Amino acid sequence: MNGQVTKARMNIQLWRPAALDEAYSLLEKLAPDVCAASGSTLLQLQWDKGTLPKQHLVSLEGIDEMRGISTSDTHVSIGGLTSLNECRKNPLIKRALSCFSDAASAVAAPGIRSRATIGGNIASKIGDFIPLLLVLGAELIVYQKELIRLPLGAWLSEEDFRTAIVTRVIIPRAEGERVFYHKLGRRQAFTGAAAVAAGRFLKDGSIRLAAGHADITPRRLLDSEAKWMAPGWDPHELYKTLIHELPFSSDVFMSAAYRKKAAANVIMAELMAEGGE
């Protein structure tokens, strides 16, 4: 961490609102030199990379309505302040949505999971959970002067909600359906994933696929889904579609081509296991 970042961190003004309306008012009032935080693990990573901190930090940790886990016959509701470790261990989640608790074991190192929150993972728009949540059809409850419920995919793509606070995620239960999740590379490092891929085989015979990595916003792989659902699909053609569609970029550690190949290989293995030609 360079000296400029260290000095800026020492001058951060911390705000601790107790309610959503208070937190949102602070974010509006102090913009653009402000950010919201809960576990702050992403901020730590950004600072370590040399990104200068904002002058104001609004902690969401005192907002009780962002806590709590509940289940119904159809959905699991998880408060935004729930830690990734709690997502991994909570008995309600393990019983109702085991694929989600299993995925939590693959996200980051244990020390990070104890601090990082599901709300922060989603709010970053580059979180490792997002591909899985996309294929599960998750919805968010966000606060932007009022509580708004909307699909995760819409929130990721619409600029209208860029200042909204992610208060809760609502996840449909996927009972009787096979779901897969793979995080590739650098699991135990304090860095993001090299690639993340997720899929869900629905009871109606359709499929959902999504992928992403630490530097880009994950998205559904709609062309690849359509290829797989076409009668007599060809594995070679589907592989080429995956390589073309995977939304990956290069960084100093890894090329986009390597990421694409690694993710396409694990996705193809799952598709072939489900019923390849």
UniProtKB/Swiss-Prot annotation:
Coiled coil (UniProt feature): none
E.C. no: 1.17.1.4
Protein keywords: FAD, Flavoprotein, NAD, Oxidoreductase, Purine metabolism
InterPro entries: CO_DH_flav_C_dom_sf, Diverse_Substr_Oxidored, FAD-bd_PCMH, FAD-bd_PCMH-like_sf, FAD-bd_PCMH_sub2, Mopterin_DH_FAD-bd, Xanthine_dehydrogenase_csu
Enzyme class: oxidoreductase
GO biological process, one term: hypoxanthine catabolic process
Induction text: Expression is very low in excess nitrogen (glutamate plus ammonia) and is induced during limiting-nitrogen conditions (glutamate). Expression decreases when allantoin is added during limiting-nitrogen conditions.
Cofactor: FAD
Catalytic function, reaction form: xanthine + NAD(+) + H2O = urate + NADH + H(+); hypoxanthine + NAD(+) + H2O = xanthine + NADH + H(+)
GO molecular function: FAD binding; xanthine dehydrogenase activity
PROSITE patterns: FAD_PCMH
Domain FAD-binding PCMH-type: 7-176
UniProt key word ATP-binding: no
Functional pathway: Purine metabolism; hypoxanthine degradation; urate from hypoxanthine: step 1/2; Purine metabolism; hypoxanthine degradation; urate from hypoxanthine: step 2/2
Assembly and interaction partners: Could be composed of four subunits: PucA, PucC, PucD and PucE.
Function: Oxidizes hypoxanthine and xanthine to uric acid.
Protein name: Probable xanthine dehydrogenase subunit C
